[in-house]
Structure formats: C-alpha cells, structure tokens
C-alpha cells in the first residue's frame, strides 16, 4: 500500500511517497521558505500560501519522474489538515483533493502533530512498541503525551504560555539575532566561553505537574541583557548558553517525571526542537542512567516534512480512516 503525503501547514512545502507494506520511504522532496521569510524575522502567512501554490505541482512532477511511479500506483493521498496557517493548509488540502478526484484516489486528512509523533518510525532501525511517552516540542507546541496505541493519545502536560521553540525564536529577536531562532541560539551557545556567567530560572521544573512555561525564561533573558553593560558577542554567546541550558533542563526534567508517573520505559521525542544537540545528549544520558529506550526522528525529519505526513496517512488508512467527501475542512488550531 503506497501513500503520497503532502505537507503545507506553515513554511515548508513537502511531498513524499511511503510504502506501508515495506515500511519504506520511497521518495521525499522538500522546499523550505526560510530564506523568503528570514528578512521579516518570521513567517508571513500570505507569502507562505503563495509559495505553496507555486511549488506543490513542481515537486509532484519531480517526485514521480524520479521514482518512475504514476498516480496509478498510489492508493491514498494524505495531507496536513490541522493545525497550521489556514491559508497554507487550504492550498495543500485543495491540491490533495483535486488529485484524488482526477485520479480516483482516496484522500485522508492528517493531524500535523500525529505526523511529528510518528516521525521516529522513519528511522529504519526504530522498532517502537506501545505504550510510550511522547514529547512534541516545536515552535508551536510543547506537549507530553502517553501513547497507548496508534490513535490513542492522552495529554499529560503542555506549555501554559510560549512553546519551547517559540521561546528560542523570541530570544533571538530580543538579542538582535537571526531567524530561525533554534539554530541561531544553539550555534552561538556552542561558542560560550563562560558557561556559568548567567544563571537563568527553570520555570515550573519543580512543580509536581507535567506542564511547561517558557515565557518567564524569555523575560529573564530580556532583563539580563538589558542590565548587561558589556553587550559583546562573547557575552551574547554566554547568555544563549544559559538560556538553552535552562530550557533543555526543564524539558528533560518533565520527560523524566512523565516516565515515572506513567511507569513507561519508552520515550519518543519529535518536533523541530528535537534536532537540538544538547536536548538529544541530555535525554540520551537520562535513558542510559535509568534504563529507558529513547527514539528520535532522523535529523532531516525533525522539522516539517511530507514524509511524516505520508507515514501517518498510511497508518490512518490501514486503520480504516479516509475522507468521505470533497469538503475542504482545515483548522488553525486542533488538539491531538
């Protein structure tokens, strides 16, 4: 069973083809709009939608040409329906539904977060058994789930204000740095010369619940930098290190609590922030010290991509899900 996946929820245009019977990704194409939005310091929704319109058909032609497949080989077309930028989602959904109608292929709506949650399965070496705890950590979401079976997700905790990735992005703006924030902060943090110069708070780390808060950490960065008389690149690197260290410390602590609370021994990490080297290192240490299994997506599939949508669509399709009509039903916000 072969699925074409389409991702267009924000500023990445992604198409991929996944073979469920072989558990194999056949092809994957991605166009990133980062350069387009970089000069604005963030994603401009109207521009994002227009870029999806311009690139989707080109990527589709490329992916079929390179694989030698045709639409006759496709059993289902999966597309991101929620959450995301409504205009961008509508472009991808309309493209998918149109292809489905023309070629008489079933279509299936996929939740963007479910795609991220399953993305570690794109690693051929990953054999993830249920149940497990999952941390979704990105620019728009920071959530902990207990996953008992496919499609059975229990929310354990989430950010009550800024998502972790959002805090990274806002920190770069406060410090007059570039976009996207996660990469900029991590790269500059690697250049820190005095890792103990700044001590920042760990919001909600010691709270018994599994919720997060990163707004206060962002404000602490602002106040610290405002009070700093020597705003040199060296001190900016030291502050980036302190921020990243605090944010990662909270994420790892909450993951440990979630595993203890649910009595699980398997942990799945996904979303854009899962590419962070310090986060991976600290969670690997946690797993090693406590005997847990930990699963990350391949680095190239941490951010938005069509491969995870094709994968999630395949799992949904074999579980009996598919669209019942041609209605375009996308949502900016939607819980998993």
Curated annotation (Swiss-Prot):
Organism: Francisella tularensis subsp. tularensis (strain SCHU S4 / Schu 4)
Catalytic activity: L-threonylcarbamoyladenylate + adenosine(37) in tRNA = N(6)-L-threonylcarbamoyladenosine(37) in tRNA + AMP + H(+)
SUPFAM superfamilies: Actin-like ATPase domain
Name of this protein: tRNA N6-adenosine threonylcarbamoyltransferase
EC number(s) from the headed UniProt entry: 2.3.1.234
HAMAP family: TsaD
One GO cellular component term: cytoplasm
Residues that, per the record, bind substrate: 136-140, 169, 182, 276
């Amino acid at each position: 069973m072969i699925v074409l996946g389409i991702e267009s929820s924000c500023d990445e245009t992604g198409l991929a083809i996944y073979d469920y019977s072989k558990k194999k990704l056949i092809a994957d194409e991605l166009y990133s709009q980062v350069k387009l939005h970089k000069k604005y310091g963030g994603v401009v929704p109207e521009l994002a939608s227009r870029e999806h319109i311009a690139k989707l058909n080109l990527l589709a032609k490329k992916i079929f040409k390179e694989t030698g497949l045709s639409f006759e080989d496709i059993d289902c077309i999966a597309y991101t329906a929620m959450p995301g930028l409504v205009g961008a989602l509508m472009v991808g959904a309309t493209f998918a539904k149109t292809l489905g109608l023309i070629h008489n292929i079933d279509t299936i709506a996929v939740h963007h977060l479910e795609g991220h949650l399953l993305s570690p399965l794109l690693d051929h070496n990953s054999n993830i058994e249920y149940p497990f705890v999952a941390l979704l950590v990105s620019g728009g979401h920071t959530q902990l789930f207990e996953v008992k079976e496919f499609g059975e997700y229990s929310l354990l905790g989430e950010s009550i204000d800024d998502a972790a990735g959002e805090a990274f992005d806002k920190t770069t703006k406060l410090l007059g740095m570039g976009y996207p924030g996660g990469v900029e902060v991590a790269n500059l943090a690697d250049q820190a010369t005095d890792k103990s110069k700044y001590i920042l708070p760990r919001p909600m780390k010691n709270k018994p619940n599994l919720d997060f808060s990163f707004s206060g950490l962002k404000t602490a960065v602002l106040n610290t930098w405002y009070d700093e008389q020597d705003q040199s690149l060296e001190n900016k690197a030291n502050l980036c290190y302190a921020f990243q260290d605090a944010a990662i410390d909270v994420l790892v602590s909450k993951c440990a609590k979630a595993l203890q609370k649910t009595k699980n021994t398997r942990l799945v990490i996904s979303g854009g922030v899962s590419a962070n080297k310090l986060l991976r290192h600290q969670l690997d240490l946690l797993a090693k010290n406590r005997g847990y299994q930990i699963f990350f997506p391949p680095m190239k599939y941490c951010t938005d991509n069509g491969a995870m949508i094709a994968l999630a669509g395949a799992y949904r399709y074999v579980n009996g899900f598919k669209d019942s009509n041609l209605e375009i039903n996308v949502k900016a916000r939607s819980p998993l």
